[in-house]
Regions:
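N-terminal secretory targeting modules
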Residues: 1-91, 95-107, 262-274
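Acidic/histidine-rich helix-loop elements
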Residues: 61, 116-121
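A structural signal for isolated positions on well-ordered beta-strands in alpha/beta enzyme cores
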Residues: 89, 145, 179-181, 217
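Active-site flanking residues adjacent to catalytic metal/cofactor-binding acidic residues
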Residues: 91-93, 148, 219
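Short, glycine/acidic-enriched loop or turn micro-motifs at the edges of active sites
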Residues: 96, 121, 223
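Oxyanion-hole/transition-state-stabilizing segment in secreted/luminal serine hydrolases
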Residues: 97-108, 113, 124-174, 181, ...
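Conserved beta-strand scaffold positions in the cores of enzyme catalytic domains, especially
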Residues: 114-116, 218
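Catalytic His-Asp segment of secreted/periplasmic serine-dependent ester chemistry enzymes
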Residues: 187-274
Length: 274
């Protein structure tokens, strides 16, 4: 997930145990507004209101290596959707992709008739392109799980959050019967760093944005990967980004519990009116 290209499965098996402003005079007695803060808030509002944002503009991955793997995977996902009837669809980056290699997938999610549409290195703009180009056309899942955003390098937290919200909106439009579960971005890096702060801010923005969407759910399944000294253990994230089996376990069990609740609620008969 570190590079914008697909992680080779052989490498994953080798290293992963899973093979996880306008100025105005302030009234007397009040402090002067900070123009920098005003500009930042104005920019954030513009991004979230739908102005041009690269993180919410559907974009395919550039085939820099020249082997066409990303597009091949996309075409395979579209083909898979034509002859399967999943109840749950996972879509996102390598954290979704690598989950498919873990026994936890077979234990928890295969029984739910789940499809895995994860591609290593994907950002929100890439997932949007895939969803707009066939990956949702031939299926009617009950739940779509979205886990993407940590690869949006060069985009602000506000842009990434708007990209995630655009994905939710697209799923709501294309699959109105489905609920959308958005997984929070995890902390990353062995030691405290700006990307952790950015991911935390993305989570805050997405949680707030989804609060007004009745068919969308935000799940922060981080069990506490950051220790009291500010470090992340390689036992949880083997490269301080991707999860080990130990790291995947609490995340997947929390997600599985939510999926079961949503699926069960969807099967409940309507209650008679009093």
């Amino acid at each position: 997930m570190v590079s914008p290209v697909l992680l080779p499965y052989a490498l994953c098996r080798m290293v992963s145990p899973c093979s996880r402003e306008l100025e105005s005079r302030a009234p007397r007695g009040r402090p002067e507004p900070d123009p920098g803060v005003a500009a930042r808030d104005s920019g954030a509002a513009a991004v979230m209101s739908g102005d041009h944002n690269p993180a919410s503009t559907p974009t395919p991955v550039q085939d820099l290596q020249g082997d066409g793997r990303w597009m091949s995977l996309h075409h395979r996902f579209v083909a898979d959707s034509k002859d399967k009837e999943p109840e749950v669809v996972f879509i996102g980056d390598s954290l979704v992709q690598l989950l498919h290699q873990c026994e936890l997938w077979r234990e928890l999610f295969s029984p739910l008739h789940a499809l895995n549409f994860g591609i290593g290195g994907d950002g929100t703009q890439h997932v949007l392109w895939r969803l707009e180009n066939g990956e949702l056309e031939h299926i009617r899942p009950k739940i779509v799980v979205v886990w993407v955003g940590t690869n949006n390098h060069g985009h602000t937290a506000e842009q990434v959050a708007a990209g995630i919200e655009a994905i939710v909106g697209l799923v709501n439009q294309r699959q109105p019967q489905a609920r959308v579960v958005v997984l929070a971005l995890l902390p990353r890096g062995q030691h405290p760093n700006p990307l952790r702060d950015k991911n935390r801010r993305v989570n805050e923005l997405v949680r707030a944005a989804l609060a007004s969407r009745p068919r969308a759910h935000f799940l922060d399944a981080d069990p506490g990967f950051v220790h009291s000294d500010g470090t992340i253990s390689h036992h949880d994230m083997y490269d301080y980004l991707h999860l080990t089996r130990l790291g995947y376990t609490p995340v997947c069990r929390a997600l599985h519990a939510l999926l079961l609740r949503l699926l069960t609620a969807g099967q409940a008969p309507p209650q008679p009116e009093p």
